[in-house]
Amino acid sequence: FCCPFIRYCCW
C-alpha cells in the first residue's frame, strides 16, 4: 500500500 499524497509511506 502507498499513501496517495505522502511520498515515503509505502509498506
From Swiss-Prot:
What keywords appear on the UniProt entry? Answer: Disulfide bond, Neurotoxin, Secreted, Toxin
Molecular function terms, GO-annotated: toxin activity
On whether Coiled coil is a keyword of this UniProt record, the answer is: no
Give the principal location in a single coarse category. secreted
Where does it live in the cell? Secreted
InterPro entries, alphabetized: Toxin_26
**Any one GO CC term of the record:** extracellular region
Tissues where this protein is expressed: Expressed by the venom duct.
Which cysteines bridge via disulfide bonds? C2-C9, C3-C10
Q: Which Pfam families match?
A: Toxin_26 (PF08097)
What the record says about its domains? The cysteine framework is V (CC-CC).
Similarity annotation = Belongs to the conotoxin T superfamily.
Q: What does this protein do?
A: Causes dorsal fins drooping in fish. No effect is observed when injected into mice.
Q: What is this protein called?
A: Conotoxin au5a
Source organism of the structure = Conus aulicus
Lineage start: Eukaryota, Metazoa, Spiralia, Lophotrochozoa, Mollusca
